């Protein structure tokens, strides 16, 4: 059974186009409120948002929808997605709601939900909400309508939580750190976290105007961070995305480190302290060099589908703690219930401080394999899955690469494209194999 509205990370789209319209969002909140009231007489919902101008409108629609179903609302204001997850759990709320489209431009927005435990909701819950949306609204009577209040110190509570995950015997004194907030939800919080731990902070991407979120800054545009680190002779650079659940880091030389490398560092740091790490979870896109390096240390490596939701599901199924993907979504389940860019950055800085080594030194054992990614546009109705030529070229590439590379073919979820990715120790070999497979799709 397919969901009509929910995707892999809530409901997302262009503001003013279905389903991101105020009337639909009001109906959505009303339906969610009715679902909550089936198991709880007087639920309380927390609502946080990023800095998009449309957040005001959607916040009002959510508030009205929940109140109309007899649900109380607590408004958190601009707050990172992981901050909403944390406060939902800490405040013993029934549900957390985030208004954000993450790394997308300002014209997009979305709604995602967290359970009372601070976890993303499962498919069954989403199916129940969509089924309730099909029903006629059942408005609460006047005496049962929900109320709304603000939690004025939401940001401060989350700042203290982030700092609590950093070793108390360590400090960031003496470090100059550039922090790029993507003009998003962490624009005030991120600089404060590192400043209060002792660092000299240079903030960029921390002046939102409602329209500039992720615009040339943040984790999806890391060149701004690289330039600022080099210009200010900083020790580190930290870039978040619009809702601060994603991380990219830069060292003093301007070298960019992606999520694959951060995952290896997080695992290796724990191994160096004598902790047992039976396994970790990456995705289909995680660089093979990370898998090889971790297996050499006796750490099992498992690939999930792309998306932090699927990484989390695999971690919970296996009882493991650490996972992540190259885009910068990192999970450390003994620190937080969801991916958190700030906490991930603190874990990296903690590893550097404990070892008295730089990022490059800590990652010297991992040399990422070159990757070639080719997007091939599919013809209308093209049956690529049953193409004999594609199957033959894919098999030939797999034989040629052996244990020194891999090939991944997957369809885009949003465009008529087939993505052909080849990874190998040799860049030219990766390119040649990818071209042959892509040509088979085009033929």
From Swiss-Prot:
Its EC number is 5.4.2.10. Its cofactor is Mg(2+). Keywords: Isomerase, Magnesium, Metal-binding, Phosphoprotein. GO terms for cellular component: cytosol. Binds 1 Mg(2+) ion per subunit. It catalyses: alpha-D-glucosamine 1-phosphate = D-glucosamine 6-phosphate. Activated by phosphorylation. SUPFAM superfamilies: Phosphoglucomutase, C-terminal domain (SSF55957), Phosphoglucomutase, first 3 domains (SSF53738). It comes from the Bacteria. The active site is at 102 (phosphoserine intermediate). One of its GO terms (biological process) is UDP-N-acetylglucosamine biosynthetic process. Gene3D superfamilies: Alpha-D-Glucose-1,6-Bisphosphate, subunit A, domain 3, Alpha-D-phosphohexomutase, C-terminal domain. It is an enzyme of class 5 (isomerase). Mg(2+) binds at residues 102, 241, 243, 245. One of its GO terms (molecular function) is phosphomannomutase activity. InterPro entries: A-D-PHexomutase_a/b/a-I, A-D-PHexomutase_a/b/a-I/II/III, A-D-PHexomutase_a/b/a-II, A-D-PHexomutase_a/b/a-III, A-D-PHexomutase_C, A-D-PHexomutase_C_sf, A-D-PHexomutase_CS, Alpha-D-phosphohexomutase_SF. The modification Phosphoserine is found at residue 102. Belongs to the phosphohexose mutase family. Catalyzes the conversion of glucosamine-6-phosphate to glucosamine-1-phosphate. This is Phosphoglucosamine mutase.
